Design a protein with these regions (language model features):
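Phosphate/pyrophosphate-binding loop motifs in nucleotide- or prenyl diphosphate-using proteins
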Residues: 1-186
Length: 186
C-alpha cells in the first residue's frame, strides 16, 4: 500500500512546531512564523493599534500645527510596527524641532524650557488638553507592553530603540499639553 504524503507545513512556530493551516488562536509574528495571540509581541502590536486609534481621535479634535504634529506622530507610531516586524532600526525621533534628548529635556524642565510649571490636568482644562493627556497614557501603556515584549532574561532589551522612541513620544505629549496649558503656539 503506497504511503500517503504529508502535506507541506505552511506555518511554523519559533520552537519548530509545524502547521499546514493557521490555527485561529495563533497569528503571524513575522513571515510564516506563528505565535499564540497572547504572545507579548502581539500584545505590544495591539497596544500600537490602540495608540493609533487614540492618535486619530486626538488629531481629529485638533487643528493647525497641533494637528500636523499629531499626524506626524501617527506616521512615526506606524513606523514602529514596521521596525518590529521587519527588524529594522527605528527612525530618528524629531518633533517640534527637537530631537529625542531635547524632547526629554523640555518635558522634564517645563518651566525653564517652556515657561510653564509642572501641573496636573484638571476637569477645567480645555478638552484638547485632556485628550492629549489620554493620548499620553496610551503611549505609556504601549511603552510598558514594549518593555514586556522585548525584555530578555538577563534584564536587557532586544529592542531598546522601540522602548526609547515610545518614551520620547510620552515626553512629546507632555510638551504638547504644556503648550496648550500656557496658551502658546504648539
Amino acid at each position: 500500500m503506497p504511503h500517503a504524503e504529508t502535506p507541506p507545513s505552511a506555518y511554523r512556530t519559533p520552537d519548530g512546531a509545524a502547521f499546514a493551516e493557521k490555527p485561529e488562536h495563533m497569528t503571524h509574528l513575522r513571515g510564516n512564523i506563528l505565535v499564540p495571540k497572547t504572545h507579548p509581541r502581539i500584545a505590544f502590536r495591539g497596544g500600537i493599534d490602540t495608540l493609533e486609534a487614540e492618535l486619530l481621535l486626538c488629531a481629529q479634535a485638533a487643528d493647525g500645527p497641533l494637528r500636523q504634529t499629531l499626524c506626524a506622530m501617527l506616521d512615526f507610531v506606524r513606523s514602529l510596527i514596521r521596525a518590529d516586524v521587519l527588524d529594522e532600526p527605528v527612525q530618528t525621533v524629531r518633533f517640534l524641532g527637537l530631537d529625542g534628548d531635547g524632547l526629554r529635556e523640555h518635558s522634564h524642565h517645563p518651566e525653564r524650557e517652556e515657561g510653564q510649571p509642572h501641573f496636573l490636568p484638571a476637569p477645567e482644562d480645555p478638552p484638547i488638553l485632556l485628550r492629549l493627556n489620554r493620548l499620553r497614557t496610551a503611549v505609556r501603556q504601549t511603552e510598558l507592553l514594549a518593555c514586556h515584549a522585548f525584555s530578555r532574561p538577563d534584564g536587557t532589551l532586544a529592542r531598546p530603540d522601540i522602548v526609547k522612541a515610545l518614551n520620547r513620544l510620552s515626553s512629546l505629549c507632555w510638551i504638547l499639553m504644556i503648550r496648550v496649558k500656557r496658551g502658546g503656539q504648539v
